[in-house]
Amino acid sequence: TINDIRATNPALWNGWKHQLLKDLYVLSRLKINKEPVKASSDIAKDRMKNALVDFNKDNQNYLKDYFSNLNNIYFNKNPSNSLKWQSATIIKNKDKDLIVGCKNRFENLIEIFIKVDNSEGLFYKLTKILEHSGLNIIDANIFTSIDNIFAANTFIAKFSHHDRKFSKFDLKELSKRIEKNYIQF
């Protein structure tokens, strides 16, 4: 955690660093209080169940099929609220091969979820597309399905031309721009 904070721009104090320190505090408190720490497989199961709660049976089954192709690391790396948001984004766009969702994360940072067919050089392609879309990447979580068919990637990014928070309209437009840039790449 300390190395993560030191590795980022010193002028960048934001919710991301706040969240890192909060997580460190909570885990330290659990250890000091000797509360049992859950196994990563239990955390993954809990987060998966939590992500499914708001959906009807058909959509739950669709998401269970999707989740079954991801390992525990995916669920341990993504917080429950992000998994719920990603799940809703997938359900809204389940007829698409390329799914892009954008949401405000902390202050002027954006969380970008991209689910796409896996291919050679995909990470490079996605980073170039985000750069071409006017974004600076702060963090990335890259996941490939167990069967190597699709990738479910999450980026934390900042718009390179301003520091303001994005409106819902801005986020939808950004999603469309990323999709367009992906297709044209």
Where are the language model's segments positioned?
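Regulatory modules associated with amino-acid/nitrogen control
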Residues: 1-185
